[in-house]
UniProtKB/Swiss-Prot annotation:
Pathway: Aromatic compound metabolism; 3-phenylpropanoate degradation. Coiled coil: none annotated. InterPro entries: 3-HPP/3HCI_hydroxylase (IPR023786), FAD-bd (IPR002938), FAD/NAD-bd_sf (IPR036188), PheA/TfdB_FAD_monoxygenase (IPR050631). The gene is mhpA. One of its GO terms (biological process) is 3-(3-hydroxy)phenylpropionate catabolic process. It comes from Mycolicibacterium gilvum (strain PYR-GCK) (Mycobacterium gilvum (strain PYR-GCK)). It comes from the Bacteria. This is 3-(3-hydroxy-phenyl)propionate/3-hydroxycinnamic acid hydroxylase. Keywords: Aromatic hydrocarbons catabolism, FAD, Flavoprotein, NAD, Oxidoreductase. Catalyzes the insertion of one atom of molecular oxygen into position 2 of the phenyl ring of 3-(3-hydroxyphenyl)propionate (3-HPP) and hydroxycinnamic acid (3HCI).
Length: 569
């Protein structure tokens, strides 16, 4: 595609959000051009924490087994007061989405795996050394121009994943509302970890708050608050850096320093994530403090949410109105993450000793209450997507605790051919219709069943293990899975709904009892602006076929994954 100047999607920025989005679109046969003003990928870590949702997305694009070697799963985060008394601990035990909730990771190595994944596709190209300076929308295209007289490109859509100083956002003319903290931090990355333990800690010491994070591969990050009377130049001095390190390690002069720099925290969100054919994702759309490690992960969520929608529109499986749901769904959740990260930062880093002492007393008192202690330990405070509007259907007959708009769980299951598979590996990468132990074709009716089949949806019947090999409902179009851990039975135990319409990003788009499935299916097609079949605009497919993915090679997860369950973009 070297000479290609006419593509479906231009992605501006080869960071994690842009690379993940390119992989999602590449799998769907969408013609993608990724451009970046740099000459190569950034080779130093910015984000240091991966969550379960990001790993689930990497699983969906077939790259999780390449990413896992660069992670520290199930990483514990401990908060200490000035006397090193434990204030709180975060060690979430469950892996309801298939992966650990907290993982340290080496961002440059993970980003390199995302970049390497694009080599599987002959419909995706990356061009470094291309700085976009103009993009002009017409009725059905966007004309993209670059500095230095480089050839312009015509695309149907442009997605700006070009960071906090986004050129795309500026060209869209949208605001970047929020605040920038006056507090500065010194970040120091060190090879050959001088501490060597696998976990991370925050020192909530009012004299000088600090952070110590185990990344992976023997890399550790230290962060120290810089006092107002200390200049950036002073903080950049190697002697100052060694003095800071000397608070935590015995021989700071012996460390193998990778880099150090001064930074500030931003809490900002774009006024709009979409203007016509231009969209924003990752840091271009939102910036947040580092305290919850959600900057990187929020960019991956953007890519997962936007990717399937763009692919559906470009390949003719949905109307353009579906793209309106991107801002509707992602804005509220990104805002919640920004607010949480900002609040945690305020709790961690007061420099007034009386305020810090009061905080410590409150936290110690709260820790004596088991339910509050579990709330923190299991990270139940983390905002989870629950879409009330967007690409979902909340119908009049839904139960009060309807799962619609939430992420479906991902336990391990058995099929008749494999054991201990992650659920998403059975559901595939597109839509899925899932039911509990029922005849799915009869439940949906032939018309609805045929419409979902034309969109490439997978049909999955969940059964108790005792019924896995019973042939009574066998249908060549329906996969039968056994609930090997009981997690799916437990999930259905607390929900009235037994039929689920699951989106490609694993959000439940609609849920209902079996008898209402045909009408809910029809309503969902309208709500998501889906077509009756895949009327492809490229790729050589015909109605009822999946698009030609133009895949050179797609690595498939093994039946037994190497995973054991858990920024910047």
């Amino acid at each position: 595609m070297t000479e290609q100047t006419d593509v479906d999607v231009v992605i501006v920025g080869a960071g994690p959000a842009g690379l993940t989005l390119a992989n999602i679109l590449g799998l769907e046969g969408v013609r993608v051009l990724v451009v970046d003003e740099r000459d190569k990928l950034i080779d130093y870590p910015r984000g240091v924490g991966l969550d379960d949702e990001s790993l689930r997305t990497f699983q969906a694009i077939g790259l999780v087994d390449r990413v896992l070697p660069h992670t520290v799963p199930n990483q514990i985060l401990r908060f200490f007061d000035a006397k090193r008394n434990l204030l709180a601990e975060m060690a979430p035990p469950d892996a309801r989405f298939g992966w650990p909730k907290r993982n340290g990771f080496v961002q440059p190595m993970v980003d390199a795996e995302l970049f390497g994944g694009l080599q599987r596709f002959d419909n995706v190209e990356v061009r470094f050394g291309h700085r976009m300076h103009q993009c002009t929308q017409t009725t059905d295209r966007v004309e993209v121009e670059f500095d230095g007289g480089q050839a312009s490109v015509s695309a149907r859509y442009v997605v700006g994943c070009d960071g906090g100083r986004s050129v795309t956002r500026r060209l869209m003319g949208v605001s970047f509302d929020g605040t920038t903290s006056s507090t500065r931090w010194l970040v120091v990355d060190i090879a050959n970890d001088p501490l060597g333990h696998p976990n991370s800690e925050v020192g909530a010491d009012p004299r000088r708050p600090y952070v110590s994070i185990a990344i992976a591969h023997g890399i550790r990050r230290f962060e120290f608050m810089i006092h107002p009377d200390e200049t950036d130049e002073e903080a950049d001095d190697p002697a100052f850096v060694r003095r800071m390190l000397g608070q935590l390690i015995p021989y700071p002069e012996r460390v193998d320093m990778i880099r150090h720099r001064v930074y500030t925290h931003h809490s900002r969100i774009a006024g709009s994530f979409r203007e016509g054919r231009l969209m924003l994702a990752g840091d271009a759309a939102h910036l947040m403090p580092v305290w919850q490690g959600q900057g990187y992960n929020s960019g991956i969520r953007d890519a997962a949410n936007l990717g399937w929608k763009l692919a559906a529109v470009v390949t003719g499986r949905a109307g353009e109105e579906l793209l309106d749901t991107y801002d509707v769904e992602r804005r509220k959740h990104a805002r919640a993450m920004i607010d949480l990260s900002t609040m945690v930062g305020r709790v961690i880093s007061p420099t007034n000793r009386k305020v810090a002492a009061l905080r410590d007393r409150v936290i110690h008192a709260a820790s004596a209450v088991p339910s509050l202690k579990r709330y923190v330990l299991e990270m139940r405070f983390k905002p989870m997507p629950r879409y009330q509007q967007g690409a979902v259907l909340h119908h009049a007959h839904a139960a009060p605790n309807s799962p619609t708009g939430t992420l479906f769980i991902q336990p391990r299951v058995d099929t008749r051919d494999t054991q201990n598979a992650l659920l998403d590996d059975v559901l595939g990468t597109g839509f899925a219709v899932v039911c509990w132990s029922n005849n799915l074709r009869a439940v949906l009716g032939e018309e609805a069943f045929g419409r979902w089949k034309a969109l490439g949806a997978k049909f999955v019947e969940v059964r108790p293990m005792s019924q896995l090999r019973w042939p009574g409902h066998d249908d060549p179009d329906v996969a039968v899975i056994g609930d090997r851990t009981g997690a799916l039975k437990a999930w259905f135990d607390v929900h009235t709904e037994s039929v689920l319409f699951v989106r490609p990003d694993r959000c439940i788009a609609a849920a209902c009892i079996a008898q209402r499935a045909p009408e809910i299916s029809e309503g969902l097609f309208a709500a998501l602006h889906l077509t009756s079949g895949a009327h492809l605009t490229q790729g050589g497919g015909t109605d009822g076929e999946k698009p030609d993915r133009a895949v050179l090679h797609v690595a498939q997860p093994a039946a037994e994954s190497s995973g054991t369950g858990a920024g910047t973009s």
